[in-house]
Amino acid sequence: MKKQKQVLALLLATACLLPQAVSGGSLLAAETPKQLDVVVRHDTHSHLNSFTTVTESGTEEVGGFSRMKTIIDAQKEKNPDTLILDGGDFSMGTLVQTIYEDEAAELRMLGELGCEVTTLGNHEFDYRSKGLANMLNNAAASGEDLPELLVCNVDWEAMEAAGLSEGQQIIRDGFTEYGVKDYVVLEKGDVDVAVIGVFGKDALACAPTCELQFEDPVEAVKETVAEIGANEDVDMIVCVSHSGTWEDERKSEDEILAKNVPELDLIVSGHTHTELAEPIVHGDTYIVSVGEYGKNLGSLSMTQKENGRWNITEYELIPIDTQIAQDAATQERVDAFMAAVDTGYLADFGYTREMVLAQNESIEFASLNDLEFVHTEHNLGNIMSDAFAYAVEHADGYDGNPVDVAVVPSGGVRDTYGLGDITVESVFNSYSLGIGADGVPGYPLISVYLTGKELKIAAEIDASISDYMTTARLYMSGLNFSYNPNRMILNKVTDVYLVDNEGNRVELEDDKLYRVVADLYSGQMLSAVTDMSYGLLSLVPKDAEGNPIEDFEDVIIMEGGKELKAWDAIARYMQSFPDTAEDGIANVPVSYSEIEGRKQVEDSKNIADLIKNPNKYAVMIVAIVLIVILIVVFIIRLVVKLIKRMSRKNADRIVKK
């Protein structure tokens, strides 16, 4: 009887628990998957204000933090736990950069937008170690809400082992003051997100003034992910990367990162200014990019899968244009920073940012994409290189030594010119990078000498190397050349010559020295171009006596004790144009609507065109190929002889048996 009561009690208890178990199971089955909304941007390059540029739709006004703020506020009203991320290169590209060091306007305005995380891009190093450190110190001193600054692959251990340089120590102190970290964990509602920052290999190659050493990005991110796994309990791992993507997947740094660190759920990919209409996907890792200068914001929604990984369920590039209202408070802050530019930096040059230098009535200048990705002559490169030559030959104290060639690399060009007024601000924005030895923003012009033989190499650099390093596309005044893209690498140029002021052809003399004008950045980047060609295409800039230049800051062009800035050279050239409308304002000559034959493409696959006039590099390559073929033939013949000999021996053994 007692046993029967125990069984009955057990059945009753089970019956009581069953509804709860069923109810709990139903709740689990119906539980909503975790979700996260993310807004991303990168490569805004000091574009706090909206600006006029040339797009596929023509000349239009785009960008601006006040319009971004409107979009972000609307998103946060919908979901207060939206994650706001930036992929670096937040500075260098407009007049705002002239107050970068003292005001830290870019970082402070990222905070104004509610951005929670950013990383360093190569252009954050443009004002050298002291400039970066001062910016970080002043940002921290502002007391404002600022984004976390994350970089996981600075190799402090290696630098400490060698002994920190003064510049490295200055940056380290700035990092400490600001609170730079490898990663951070953010709570976004019920989602715990680990965010890592990383600085890429190509970014470092594009930062000639950077004194820091970096670990391999992939290895550093792997180590950081392992650290997060050991010490944190997170739902998602995101990487803000200033590494970029390329068409060639084998060289596409953030794709390499995604493949080698599969634990990453999302990579915000900066540096290459890529605009991805759809994410790149490798395994469970998504890569997103939204383009440059704040022309777009990226908006995406992610949903967690049953296995704990995430899907992007919504992805949109939101154009930032005049259809979006400006947030008044944000625009007021931007205007205050711009007023400081007028009364400070520009006053020293005798300009204001809205001052009209020239009017462009009808000329469609090439876009930035054209300069980098359409390998031919472009009128934007022509007008800028002409400006460099003009400014040097019309500067106070000009020594009478004419400029033979002026060079503009596509990597130095930051914007184009639209129709209508060309202002001081638009000219500065078009060639805004860097700082001189004087500590004043803007790369100065330098004057060097190259031999005729080296000028031919410069043409070959554009023809052969710039497809692999698009920032090395060269636009030149005074030097014309033709190339055939189908010819052997390092042997693509078929004709190269000088053009005098009357437009006459002048043949180059291999050993003669020619005066060449470029900006300081071009000189600093020569080593990267040499590395890209494995040392085969090497230029050695010289002084007028033919002595190699050891420090490009020694050959900066000075005027009245001040550096002649590249952007100011363009501004002066614009002002020099004739006033054809007779309204007191210069007009861009219609001649710039035409291509002049400075860089001609001979797209021929005719065998005679492919092999005619081979240069020494072609001969070297052919010789190497022939030697390799001879070695292979020799090895094959040797193997054949050995096989025959062994066959004979085996046959002899069989006969003897």
Walk through the language-model features, giving the residues of each:
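N-terminal secretory signal peptides that target proteins for export/translocation
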Residues: 1-3
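Sec-dependent N-terminal signal peptides
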Residues: 5-15, 24, 620-624
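Sec-dependent signal peptide cleavage junction
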Residues: 18-32
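Acidic, metal/ion-coordinating pockets
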Residues: 28-323, 387, 449, 466, ...
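Catalytic centers of hydrolytic enzymes
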Residues: 32-40, 46-61, 65-71, 77, ...
